[in-house]
Amino acid sequence: MINYAPLWKTMEEKHISSYALIEKYGFYKATIQRLRKNQSVNLRTIDDLCQILNCSVEDIVEIVLEPDVPLPRTIRRQP
């Protein structure tokens, strides 16, 4: 599962608000809502956030493994 909790912490540390992302940097409100709901966004959005916040991907997103969720047939976990 994708979790954007690190993004909100990084934004707070860098004194950048959601409002600033929308008004100053041209983010769509819908994109901010997708991030708030931990929904998928494209890599360009992640890259833009990294550039604006001067941070790495790990400062924006974390992957939380869900062991009980079956993987698609195309993805196999190594033992």
Predicted features and spans:
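Short, charged recognition helix plus adjacent turn
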Residues: K9-T10, E62-P79
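Hydrophobic micro-packing sites on short alpha-helices
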Residues: T45-C50, I60-V61
